[in-house]
Structures are given as C-alpha cells and as structure tokens.
Amino acid sequence: MISDYPDTKQEVEATSRQNIHLANVFVNYERVFGKGWKINAGTNVQLSFTDNSSFTYQDKQEDLSATFAQKEKEYTAGLYAGFSKRFGKKLVLSASLSAEYNKAVIDSAGRKWTLWSGVNLYPQLNLSYTIDPSNMLQVNFSSDKKYPAYWAMSSNVSYLNVYSQVRGNPYLEPERIYMARANYILKKKYVFGLFANHHVNYIRQLYYQDTKALRAYYQSVNFDKHNTFGAMAVIPFRIGGAVSSRFVASGLLIQDEGIFIDIPFDRKKLFGQLMLFNTFTLSKKKNLSLEVNARYSAPSIQGIYDVDGIYNVSAGLVWNPIPKKLSVMLRGEDLLKGLRAKTHIDYPSQKSDMTIYSDTRSVSLTLKYTLGKMNRKNKKEIDSSRFGQ
C-alpha cells in the first residue's frame, strides 16, 4: 500500500512540567540468637504524589491531543522477615520473604481511576554448599520489582519532530521479576551455571507506525510474558607470567509474548554472548599493565523488534606508581564503534529499519589517590530512576 501525503510545514512548541513529592519511612531490626541464627525483620512505608503537565502548540494553535494535566498518588506499605544460618562446615543458608501492598490512583481530565492495587510477595533464597575445599555449589532464588517512570504513566504526547512522537501510557503496571540461578565452582576458579528469569508485566518501549496518518510513535507497554533461560561458563587462564585472561560464554533462549496496539506477538530466539577480559603485565617493577576487553552479543529480539548483534572493544592503561595508594588509568571505550544498535520491524503495515547513530566512543583519564580507610555510613539512597522524561 502506497499513500500520498501532501507536503506540509509544521511548527511545534511544547512546555512540560513535573513535580514529585516523595516520603519514605523504614525500620529494620536485626538480632543474633544462640547457635548462629541471625534474624532480621522490618517494615517500610512510602508515599508519592506526582503532578505531570504539558502544553503543546502546533502552528500557534493549542494541540489538545498533546496537552494534558495529570496527578498520580502512590501508596506502598511492606513487611519483611528473614534469617541466615551456617549448618556445620559445609552448608550456609539464608532466606527471606517480604509482602508489599501497592496502590496507584490517577486523576486526569476530571476522571479518577485506580491503576493498580494489591499485595505481592517477594521471596529470597541463598544456599551455598562446600563439597570439598576446591569445589562448591551455589543456588540462588530472588525476586524484585520495577516501577515505570512517572512521566511514562502520563497521558502525554511529546514530539521528537513533526513525524515522530513519544506517547505515555497511563495504564502501565509495575514489573515483577523472579530469578533462579545455580552455579558450580570447580577448582576455585571455573564457574558453570544455569539460570532462568521470569518477568510479569515486563516493561519495554516499542515503535508503531500509524496506519491512518503520516506519523509514528514510541510507547512503553507491558508484555504478557518475558522469559529468559540460559547457561554460562567462566574460564580463567594464564599465558606465561605476563598475561591473565578470563573467558565468559553464555547461551540464552528468550521468549516475548504480548499485544502492542493491534499487533499480537509470540516470539522465541536463541542467541549467545561472548566476553574476553585480558590483563597484560607490561612492567612488574613499575606496576604498569594494559587491559584489553572484548564483548559480543549475537542478534536477539525485543517484542516486535529484531535486534542486530553488537560488540564492544575497550582498552585501558593502568599505572600504580604507589601501590595501594596512587593509581592512574587511561581508558578508551567502544574503540571500533560496535555499540550502535540497529533494529528492524517486519510486520504487516509495520516495516522499519532503525540505526542509533549516537557516538559511544570515549576516552577518559582517571587519577585516584587513597588517603586511608574510611568508614562509610549506611544510608538509604533516593531512587531517582522514575524521575524526569
């Protein structure tokens, strides 16, 4: 199908604003009981109030489809408890469980609705079993959550240019992540592992070409399913006394399933990743070494995207004139310009090729001097990952 659109000239002006008020209170309790039982428990409460707005004009006229004002309130309350214990000389076990209540309410265009409300459980389990002094088995199960950015949850339409837009999604839900991993450590240096990741309401931004107008837009959506299964191996080795290397290989099966606008997708892809880290000792007397690292990721998928393979070659010259005190590093990243992502979409009415032309090459010089030991106070950092546009 070929559509003929008349040539037009448009002028777009937009002013956006975001105000966020965030309050968080948490309490943690730890105690060690007899026979090495360590117990911890606690609670946390968080409130957030977000005010997003944008005023957009096309050719000096207000664009009502891209002008909005939206308020959002989120409430979070959680409890957690856990323990850790060493059993004999071989087994170390720790486990915890947290229960968290979340509620989000949106007020936009005179209408209020509850975006999400409910209780979710987040278990954690870590087991380490020493088979003998040289071999060990480690098993880990963990869970976490990821919230969408506040701006992505608004009813906004932001113009990248007169053709491309970024649209918000006021129906985005938090993503829950469950991860399982088992590693076998052989001879204290070789690592062989299996892993599986399951994502509920997986959040990703996809690209859609409008079938009724000369327009395309990006929008973050929740996938129905995103699973990753894989195996990995870490092989360290030395070449003579001057070269120390570590080779990491992994094979993965990725599965994406969901509906984006009017495009259902159910896709699977096998791909691999290779990494090689090398340290060349140039002078032991002068504490001078060269680091050369290479990474390659084979072609994969992301929703309706086909993603080309990417690679990165980096190098760094490290000099320690005063061991454990003064270090100087000259480092270069993406020396061969291999991190330029390329994606392709090939669906009925949706065909596109995209290359990110941003230059990710960089050169940095770092000087580090250690004055002495410093006792850092434990403090909870403010999570700013949801701020901004």
Question: Where is each model-derived feature located?
Answer:
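Outer-membrane beta-barrel translocator domains and adjoining extracellular loop/strand segments
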Residues: 1-6, 51-60, 105-114, 150-158, ...
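Face-selective signature of the C-terminal outer-membrane beta-barrel domain
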Residues: 1-108, 130-134, 138, 190-194, ...
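Transmembrane beta-strands of outer-membrane beta-barrel pores
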Residues: 45-51, 99-105, 113, 141-147, ...
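Outer-membrane beta-barrel signature, preferentially recognizing the C-terminal barrel domain
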Residues: 72, 145-194, 198, 216-229, ...
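Gram-negative outer-membrane beta-barrel transporters
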Residues: 224-297
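C-terminal beta-barrel architecture of Gram-negative outer-membrane proteins
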Residues: 274-320, 326, 331-337, 344-345
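C-terminal beta-signal and adjacent terminal beta-strands/loops
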Residues: 321-389
